[in-house]
Curated annotation (Swiss-Prot):
The gene is murE. Carboxylation is probably crucial for Mg(2+) binding and, consequently, for the gamma-phosphate positioning of ATP. Transmembrane segments: none annotated. It catalyses: UDP-N-acetyl-alpha-D-muramoyl-L-alanyl-D-glutamate + meso-2,6-diaminopimelate + ATP = UDP-N-acetyl-alpha-D-muramoyl-L-alanyl-gamma-D-glutamyl-meso-2,6-diaminopimelate + ADP + phosphate + H(+). Its cofactor is Mg(2+). This is UDP-N-acetylmuramoyl-L-alanyl-D-glutamate--2,6-diaminopimelate ligase. NCBIfam families: murE (TIGR01085), PRK00139.1-2 (NF001124), PRK00139.1-4 (NF001126). Pathway: Cell wall biogenesis; peptidoglycan biosynthesis. The keyword Cell division applies. One of its GO terms (molecular function) is ATP binding. Pfam families: Mur_ligase, Mur_ligase_C, Mur_ligase_M. The modification N6-carboxylysine is found at residue 211. It is found in: Cytoplasm.
Length: 479
């Protein structure tokens, strides 16, 4: 088939490949693939109307349409076309999985590469970020782990523009659905593990095994896994990887790289650790003990790619916090964080509670997303009641669920603690800011970097950090 595909590309002056009729561009080939929820064959005419020069399908019913070509296996044809059209990748690849911390680690790794004078990029929840050169990528699908075509297209574009190092997030959904196909990485990282996505995986064991596919299916034979030693299931993970002949090293309070002491404040933290029988310490403006682990996972990732350990450590002082990840807004005591799981919310609240002044109060504004894991909602209410002094329950991205019912499920876990329920997220944030007293801390949790709110089918502009800034101008908080 290779010869035929190459001929087709030349004959029709093909400019690109597409599996989504919404993103088809002039001179693209559209591959009509049947997915989990939609069938590309239903959108053939739409793709042609947008400029597709050809459509490839394995559904014989559609070959009566002009410009439609039948093949026995459309997926195989797509993969063959990708190898012809988007063959290049950056020379070194690192993948990061984990319930929480993926976005932070990929950003820290890419930032550090740049600080070491290398051209690097990251792909994940926040999108494509390019360090050391201008931004080259537009129209990125909103998935933590991209579909295989999108990934290869972006990786090829990056390599064509001189990007040497690529680090990306690997979600449990993406791994379970084999979106990465045959992609192999030099380093694979595991940041954290706790309950999430049970609406998809059904059990925590299935969820964990999906994560571990990264190390079994995608790590090069001479590659290394970098694991957070403080994961509750770490012994199972180590045994599982050992049984599959995967080399690994651990980071954490009981790791091969051992975190020995943290001194945290609202301005940042001093991190002390030992590695290879040497003691180290460095300062960072990034807040949170969990971020200490994330930073050091990033350090080992780059070290095992081939960079001198001390050079990597020296660059850490310039690594910046990631948007929406324990992001301190304009030097106030107001933080925006993506914490949307029970574990992430507990860690964020615990960190802020530990660094607040004794007589000050900790407030939290949060909700839960609709059409997602319902089991975590009451747990998050329970955690807020345990860790925060003031609780404000609001809407997150309700999607197609009744937001009032989502809030009720959160509130069911709060039990005896006081709370305030304000459906409108902006009003909830404003209420939280207005009620701050001297030295109080406010955490706005759940949406982090997102610049939208999904209500039904509508995706409305909304940015927690910008709403906080707007409220600060009006409210003049004392924090």
């Amino acid at each position: 088939m290779s010869h035929n595909l190459k001929q087709l590309f030349q004959q029709h002056n093909v400019k690109g490949l597409s599996i989504n009729s919404k993103t088809v561009k002039d001179k693209d080939i559209f591959f009509a693939i049947k997915g989990r929820n939609t069938d590309g064959n239903d959108f053939i005419k739409d793709a042609l109307s947008k400029g597709a020069v050809l459509v490839i399908t394995d559904n014989k019913k559609n070959i009566v349409i002009d410009k439609v070509i039948y093949v026995k296996d459309v997926q195989a044809a797509l993969y063959e076309a990708i190898e012809i059209f988007y063959p290049k990748k950056p020379k070194d690849l690192i993948a990061v999985t984990g319930t929480n911390g993926k976005s932070s680690v990929v950003s820290y790794i890419a930032q550090t590469y740049s600080l070491l004078g290398k051209k690097a990029a990251s792909i994940g929840t926040i999108g494509v970020e390019i360090f050391g050169c201008v931004n080259l990528i537009n129209d990125v699908p909103e998935l933590t782990t991209l579909d295989y075509l999108s990934f290869r297209k972006i990786a090829h574009n990056l390599a064509e523009n001189g990007i040497e190092y690529l680090v990306f997030e690997a979600s449990s959904h993406g791994l379970d659905q084999a979106r990465l196909r045959e992609i192999k990485v030099n380093i694979a990282c595991f940041t954290s593990f706790s309950q999430d996505h049970l609406d998809y995986h059904h059990t925590k064991e299935n969820y964990l095994l999906a994560k571990l596919k990264l190390f079994i299916n995608h790590l090069l034979p001479n590659g290394i896994a970098i694991l957070n030693s403080d994961i509750e299931e770490i012994e199972f993970v180590k045994d599982y990887l050992h049984n599959h002949n995967v080399k690994f090293i651990t980071v954490g309070t009981k790791g091969d790289l051992e975190i020995t002491r943290l001194n945290c404040s609202l301005k940042g933290q001093n991190i002390n650790f030992t590695f290879n029988n040497r003691e180290y310490n460095f300062n960072t403006p990034i807040i949170g003990s969990f971020q200490a682990s994330n930073l050091l996972i990033a350090v080992l990732s780059i070290h095992y790619i081939g960079f001198a350990f001390d050079d990597v450590i020296d660059s850490l002082v310039e690594v910046k916090a990631v948007k929406g990840r324990m992001e301190r807004i304009d030097n106030t005591n107001i933080f925006v964080d993506y914490a949307h799981t029970p574990d992430a919310l507990e860690k964020a609240l615990t960190e802020l509670k530990n660094i607040k002044l004794r007589d000050s109060k900790l407030s939290v504004v949060f909700g839960c997303g609709g059409n997602r894991d319902k089991a975590k909602r009451s747990l998050m209410g329970q955690i807020a009641a345990k860790r925060a002094d003031t609780i404000i329950i609001t809407d997150d991205n309700p999607r197609h669920e009744d937001p009032k019912l989502i809030r009720a499920e959160i509130i069911s876990g709060i039990e005896k603690a006081d709370y305030t329920e304000i459906a409108n997220r902006e009003e909830a944030i404003k209420y939280g800011i207005n009620n701050l007293k001297q030295d109080d801390i406010l955490l706005v949790a759940g949406k982090g970097h997102e610049n939208y709110q999904i209500i039904g089918d509508k995706k409305l502009p909304f940015d927690d950090a910008e709403v906080v800034r707007k409220c600060i101008k009006v409210c003049h908080p004392v924090a």
